[in-house]
Amino acid sequence: MSFTLAIVGRPNVGKSTLFNRLVGRKLALVDDQPGVTRDLREGAARLADLRFTVIDTAGLEDANDDSLEGRMRRLTERAVSMADATLFVMDARAGVTTNDLVFADILRKSGRPVVLAANKAEGNAGQSGLLDAYSLGLGEPLALSAEHGEGMADLVQVLRPMIEAAASAEEAETDVDVEGEDRVITHSKPLQIAVVGRPNAGKSTLINQIIGEDRLLTGPEAGITRDAIGLTFEWDDVPMRIFDTAGMRKRAKVQEKLEKLSVSDGLRAVKFAEVVVVLLDAAIPFESQDLRIADLAEREGRAVVIAVNKWDVEPEKQQKLKDLRVGLERLLPQLRGAPLVTVSAKTGKGLDKLHAAIMKIHATWNTRISTARLNQWLAAMIEAHPPPAPGGRRIKLRYMTQAKTRPPGFVVMCSHPQNLPEAYSRYLVNGLRQDFDMPGTPIRLWMRSQADDNPYKNRKKSTPSRLNKHVRKGETKKG
């Protein structure tokens, strides 16, 4: 998952101008009217060779909670808690204001890394304000001009170590050699989960229910969540990092630039997650976009849990559950046996089952099987259903071993692997799922010829000529 930087500050200090410079396009509406950016806006930032996610927040305004400014302040505080670091922007020409002092105190108490930037510092007009910024107690301020691009090199030097540290800490351990160490969930390496689905399926509401806090903006409007931001917490004493992704719409409907970026970030969340929770709407499950999302998670080799939301308002629960199981089996055969859990994000019912399903599928995703057990199993499978004999030449399956975990991957050494039908490979994969209790887990199976490792495979056979035979015989006699 990419490093996330939240840009915060009073209205009209240049946050949106800086955001636009970082993303290289005008995504945030820029105006001289304070408070013109009223929501979180996210983009894929490029700064020199650095790549990260940047959030443009609403202005930090000292106002009562019932006003629009109060809502903006609460939302900004959430963005700060969700981001990896905060870029606090003040106006060097205006100097430090009362609101700057109040919110500098909020940022210090957050415990998150804060970079102080004095914007509009070009020329002599900003020098006094630049010196004044030291009084905020957030360290040495960076002198920037978002409008003219000044100070960007200094910003690169400050952000680089933060981004590199976050990248090494967050990346999910996948495609691990079977000889590697067992996966141990710790606070430094929490279980990484992505919650994905169509817009308005209830992803943010579900996460708020899980973590017990109203940390994500929710509402009836589809697409209200525009970013994929990770929240670290403990769920039943298990350290987890959960990503709430923007709703993945059909491509034809993804027209806004922001939504395109959000969907892209959602896809990255899937790639960096260990377990992907595909959230369906009970009223309209298994639309084509749902199937694409689940298929993407399987192709990326992630453990998958299917969660059906809004179960509290489903009138025909028993029949609907039966239809869901049939639909899952028919439409997603590659995820045969994946956990299917019914939940209500609104009431919290079913969360205990969801937690159990996540833990079980994660353990299965890390399954290791000894070579001895695998070869005993392979012999039984061959006896029950021998491989075909295309052209009268029977394919021999000689040996099997596990090559990796996360997801489980196996290699079968055989003769003529190119002639083995796909149906027989599916027979083996389905057998692995059933006999080793790996339902719903992506399984990788590779057929290899023993000749693949033969260094002399493509060499021409050398036939000695009569002259060479004569010379060799002569050399032998001389010896």
UniProtKB/Swiss-Prot annotation:
Binding-site residues, GTP 2: 197-204, 244-248, 309-312
Domain (KH-like) ranges: 367-453
Family: Belongs to the TRAFAC class TrmE-Era-EngA-EngB-Septin-like GTPase superfamily. EngA (Der) GTPase family.
InterPro entries, alphabetized: G_ENGA (IPR031166), GTP-bd (IPR006073), GTPase_Der (IPR016484), KH_dom-like (IPR032859), KH_dom-like_a/b (IPR015946), P-loop_NTPase (IPR027417), Small_GTP-bd (IPR005225)
Domain EngA-type G: 3-167, 191-366
Gene3D superfamilies noted in UniProt: 3.30.300.20, P-loop containing nucleotide triphosphate hydrolases
Name of this protein: GTPase Der
Superkingdom of source: Bacteria
Residues at which GTP 1 binds: 9-16, 56-60, 119-122
Protein's GO biological process: ribosome biogenesis
Organism: Jannaschia sp. (strain CCS1)
Keywords: GTP-binding, Nucleotide-binding, Repeat, Ribosome biogenesis
Source species taxonomy: Bacteria, Pseudomonadati, Pseudomonadota, Alphaproteobacteria, Rhodobacterales
